[in-house]
From Swiss-Prot:
<protein>
    <recommendedName>
        <fullName>Protein byr4</fullName>
    </recommendedName>
</protein>
<feature type="compositionally biased region" description="Polar residues">
    <location>
        <begin position="205"/>
        <end position="220"/>
    </location>
</feature>
<dbReference type="GO" id="GO:0071957">
    <property type="term" value="C:old mitotic spindle pole body"/>
</dbReference>
<feature type="region of interest" description="Disordered">
    <location>
        <begin position="196"/>
        <end position="220"/>
    </location>
</feature>
<dbReference type="GO" id="GO:0035591">
    <property type="term" value="F:signaling adaptor activity"/>
</dbReference>
<dbReference type="GO" id="GO:0044732">
    <property type="term" value="C:mitotic spindle pole body"/>
</dbReference>
<keyword id="KW-0963">Cytoplasm</keyword>
<feature type="modified residue" description="Phosphoserine">
    <location>
        <position position="326"/>
    </location>
</feature>
<feature type="compositionally biased region" description="Polar residues">
    <location>
        <begin position="319"/>
        <end position="336"/>
    </location>
</feature>
<comment type="subunit">
    <text>Interacts with hyperphosphorylated cdc11.</text>
</comment>
<dbReference type="GO" id="GO:0005096">
    <property type="term" value="F:GTPase activator activity"/>
</dbReference>
<keyword id="KW-0597">Phosphoprotein</keyword>
<feature type="region of interest" description="Disordered">
    <location>
        <begin position="288"/>
        <end position="336"/>
    </location>
</feature>
<dbReference type="GO" id="GO:0032991">
    <property type="term" value="C:protein-containing complex"/>
</dbReference>
<feature type="compositionally biased region" description="Polar residues">
    <location>
        <begin position="288"/>
        <end position="304"/>
    </location>
</feature>
<feature type="compositionally biased region" description="Polar residues">
    <location>
        <begin position="407"/>
        <end position="432"/>
    </location>
</feature>
<dbReference type="InterPro" id="IPR034586">
    <property type="entry name" value="Bfa1/Byr4"/>
</dbReference>
Length: 665
C-alpha cells in the first residue's frame, strides 16, 4: 500500500471543519502521551494548538466553539500536570519525528511521520498495525455527545496522570472505538467520524463508494513474474483435475505386456438358466486346445434347451485330446481332437441327467493329467485276515446284551410288537461278524417298516387316534436323533500335547529336552574355579644386563647401579652432590596404645621420634595462631560426621605428642 505523506493532501483540508477537528484531536493525543525527558516542548505544542483554532472558519457551528473551549481546557490541564511526569518514563514521542520546517511556509499543518515502530506489526503490504499493549491510550471525544467519554489512565502509570477535577472522567467503562480499527492509510477518516457522530456502527458494511477505499491496492495486482518459474497451463488445469480419462478397452498388463486384456459386457443371466462346467474344466489336460474354436457343436447354448431341461443336462459333447498328440506346444498339425459320437445321456423325469460311464472312462484314459495322493501309505489290500480262522462268538448271548426298543405306541397291540422282536431272533444266523451286523441293520429297517404299516392299518380302524399316532412318530424320530447326537465317538490316537523335543536356543543358552534344563552358561562360573598349577615349574632363565639398558638423550640408565649416567661426548661424568654425606639411620619405633576407659577398641599408633638437639628456635606470632585456630575449626566442621563419637571418649591421648615435644626441650 502507498504511504500517507501528510495530512494536507486534500486542498480543502483547512476549510473542512471535521478534518480540522480530527487533526487537532490527534495532536492533542500526541501531546498528552509524551514526556518531558524526551525533549518535547509542551509550550511549543500549546502554541501550535492555539494556532489551530478554527473559530475564524466562516462555516463554523456552535459546537465548534464548544470544542475550542474544551481544547483550551485540556491544554491548561496538560500544562499544569506536566511536572507530575517522572523522568524515567519512556517517551511516547520517540516513535515520531516532527517536521519543524513547515512553520516558515504557508503550510498550516505539519506532517507526522513514524520514525520507528518497535512494537508494531508490518504486513506484506507495508501497512503499520499497532500491537496490543497493556496500557490503554486516552480516547478522543469527537462530538458533544461523547464529551463525557474521556480517556482512562491507570494510577500506576506516570505517563497518564489522572485528572480528577475534569468533568470527562464520569464514565469509567468507556473505551475508544479507534481501538477496534487498524491504522490503515486507505481508510476514510471522515466517514468514520461521520458514523460515530450519527451513532452508527463503525464495523457495519460500507457502501459501494466507501468500499472503493478498501479495495486491494493496484500494487498488489502488478505482474511481477512470480508465476514464470512454474510450468503451469491454467487452460488445461481444470481438465486434468475434473475430467477423467476414458480407458481404452484393450489395456496392457504391466506384469505381462504380451497379454492383452479385453473388457466385455456380460448381461445378467436368468436365475433359472444354469451353466454346467465343461469337460476341460474337469480335466485340465484338455485346456491345451485352441480356446477360440469356431465349431458350434462344441459350445453350449442356453437357447437350445428350455428352462426345465437346463437344470438336468450336461454339455452335449465332450472334447478329449488324442493319444498321439505331440507334447510340443504350438504344433497344431500333429495334435488332434476326438469327439465321441455315441455318448448316451440317460434322462428321466424324476432323476438328473447322467453321462455314460464307458464314455467317461475312455476320456479319462486318454487324459495325460494324473494325480498322485500325497503321503500315501499302503497298509494292505484287505486280504491279510483271510488266512486266519474266525473266533467263536455266542451271538445269542450278545443279543441279550443289546438294548431293545423301548418306544411304546398308544393304541397298538403288544402282540405285534412282540412278534416283531421274535422275528428278529429268527433271522439272526450270520456266518461272520460283518454279515451279522448287516443283517441286524436289515432287521431294524424291516421292524420300522412293519411298525409304520401297523400304524397305517390302525388309522383305518381307529379314526380318533390319528393325533396319537402322529405324536408317536415324532417321538420315534426324536429318539433316533438324540441317540445319534449322544453317541460317543470311538477313541482316536493319543497325541502328545507337550512341545516337541527339539532344543530351544535363546541367545547363548540352549534348552536340553532330555535333561529338562538350560545349558550354555558354564563359562560364567569358570572364574571361580581354582587355577590348576603346572606339573613342573618353569625354568629360571638368566636375565642379561643388556636388556635393562635405556637411553634417553645423553642419559643412559645403568640397571646394575640403578641410576642414570651421562653419556655426553666429553665423557666426563658429573660429580655426585651427595658423595660427602652418609646415609641416614632408621631410628623410628612404633608403639600401640589401648584406651582402657572406653569399652570398645580405640587403638592408636603413636610414633616416638628421637630428634637431635634443636639449634634454632622459631617464635610463632599470635596472628599465625589465630589463623591455625580458624582453619582447625573449619576442618572439624567438615569431618565432624565422618567418625563415630563415644560418650566416654578419653581425649587425653591427644596430648601425648605435645608433652613429648615439650619434655625434650
Amino acid at each position: 500500500m502507498t504511504e500517507v505523506e501528510c495530512w494536507d493532501d486534500d486542498p480543502d483540508f483547512a476549510s473542512d471543519v471535521d478534518n480540522a477537528s480530527l487533526f487537532t484531536q490527534s495532536i492533542a493525543t500526541t501531546s498528552a502521551s509524551t514526556s518531558v525527558d524526551d525533549g518535547f516542548s509542551f509550550d511549543d505544542s500549546i502554541s501550535r494548538l492555539n494556532s489551530l483554532s478554527i473559530s475564524d472558519v466562516p462555516s463554523a457551528h456552535s459546537r465548534v466553539e464548544q470544542w475550542n473551549q474544551q481544547v483550551h481546557n485540556l491544554n491548561h490541564e496538560l500544562s499544569s500536570n506536566k511536572n507530575r511526569i517522572s523522568s524515567n518514563v519512556e517517551g511516547y514521542e520517540d516513535d515520531f519525528s516532527f517536521d519543524e520546517e513547515g512553520e516558515e511556509g504557508n503550510n498550516e499543518f505539519n506532517t507526522l511521520r513514524p520514525n520507528k515502530y518497535q512494537d508494531a506489526d508490518v504486513d506484506e503490504f507495508n501497512t503499520i498495525r499497532a500491537s496490543e499493549t497493556a496500557s490503554q491510550r486516552p480516547p478522543i471525544p469527537f462530538s458533544s455527545d461523547t464529551l463525557k467519554k474521556t480517556y482512562l489512565s491507570s494510577e500506576n502509570d506516570a505517563r497518564y496522570p489522572s485528572v480528577s477535577d475534569s468533568p470527562y472522567c464520569e464514565s469509567e467503562g468507556f473505551s475508544s472505538f479507534e481501538d477496534d480499527f487498524e491504522i490503515d492509510p486507505d481508510t476514510d477518516l471522515n466517514s468514520i467520524l461521520h458514523r460515530k457522530q450519527n451513532r452508527m456502527d463503525p464495523k457495519a458494511s460500507f457502501s459501494s463508494v466507501e468500499q472503493s477505499s478498501l479495495r486491494t491496492p493496484s500494487s498488489a495486482h502488478n505482474d511481477d513474474g512470480f508465476w514464470d518459474d512454474f510450468d503451469i497451463d491454467f487452460n488445461n488445469e481444470t481438465e486434468s483435475i475434473f475430467r477423467k480419462k476414458i480407458r481404452s478397452p484393450n489395456t496392457i498388463n504391466q506384469k505381462h505386456p504380451y497379454i492383452s486384456s479385453t473388457i466385455s459386457y456380460q448381461p445378467n443371466v436368468h436365475q433359472d438358466a444354469k451353466y454346467y462346467p465343461l469337460c476341460k474344466d474337469i480335466f485340465p489336460s484338455l485346456a491345451n486346445e485352441n480356446p477360440h474354436s469356431d465349431n458350434p457343436n462344441l459350445k453350449y447354448s442356453s437357447k437350445t434347451l428350455s428352462k426345465r431341461d437346463t437344470s438336468s443336462h450336461y454339455p452335449e459333447t465332450l472334447k478329449a485330446s488324442s493319444k498321439h498328440s505331440s507334447p510340443v506346444k504350438g504344433n497344431s498339425s500333429i495334435s488332434s481332437t476326438w469327439t465321441p459320437s455315441n455318448l448316451k445321456i440317460y434322462h428321466s423325469k424324476n432323476s438328473m441327467g447322467l453321462m455314460d460311464l464307458d464314455a467317461l472312462k475312455t476320456v479319462a484314459s486318454n487324459s495325460k493329467y494324473r494325480t498322485k495322493p500325497k503321503n500315501c501309505k499302503t497298509y494292505g489290500d484287505g486280504t491279510e485276515l483271510d488266512t486266519l480262522d474266525e473266533l467263536p462268538v455266542d451271538y445269542e448271548f450278545e443279543l441279550k446284551l443289546r438294548k431293545k426298543q423301548t418306544t411304546k405306541v398308544s393304541g397298538t397291540p403288544k402282540s405285534k410288537h412282540a412278534g416283531s422282536t421274535q422275528e428278529w431272533h429268527s433271522h439272526t444266523t450270520p456266518r461272520s461278524t460283518s454279515k451279522h451286523e448287516n443283517n441286524l441293520n436289515n432287521i431294524t429297517n424291516s421292524a420300522k417298516n412293519e411298525h409304520i404299516r401297523s400304524q397305517r392299518q390302525h388309522k383305518t380302524h381307529a379314526a380318533p387316534s390319528k393325533e396319537l399316532t402322529k405324536e408317536s412318530l415324532s417321538n420315534d424320530q426324536l429318539s433316533v436323533k438324540e441317540k445319534r447326537r449322544h453317541h460317543k465317538k470311538a477313541p482316536t490316537l493319543i497325541q502328545n500335547l507337550n512341545s516337541p523335543r527339539t532344543p530351544k536356543i535363546v541367545g547363548k543358552m540352549r534348552y536340553n529336552p532330555t535333561k529338562h534344563c538350560w545349558e550354555g552358561n558354564d563359562y560364567a562360573i569358570r572364574d571361580f574355579d581354582t587355577p590348576i598349577s603346572p606339573s613342573r615349574p618353569a625354568l629360571i632363565s638368566n636375565i642379561s644386563t643388556k636388556k635393562g639398558i635405556q637411553v634417553v638423550g645423553n642419559m643412559v640408565y645403568d640397571p646394575t647401579r640403578l641410576r642414570w649416567i651421562d653419556n655426553s661426548i666429553s665423557g666426563q661424568e658429573a660429580e655426585d652432590p651427595f658423595s660427602g654425606f652418609d646415609d641416614l639411620e632408621d631410628t623410628d619405633s612404633t608403639s600401640q596404645y589401648l584406651n582402657e576407659n572406653s569399652g570398645s577398641f580405640n587403638g592408636s599408633i603413636n610414633s616416638i621420634i628421637n630428634f637431635p638437639d634443636m639449634s634454632e628456635i622459631y617464635d610463632v606470632g599470635p596472628e599465625f595462631e589465630k589463623k591455625q585456630f580458624s582453619e582447625d575449626i573449619q576442618w572439624r566442621k567438615r569431618i565432624d560426621g565422618w567418625f563415630f563419637s563415644f560418650k566416654n571418649d578419653d581425649r587425653s591421648r591427644l596430648w601425648e605428642l605435645y608433652n613429648i615435644l615439650n619434655a625434650e626441650q
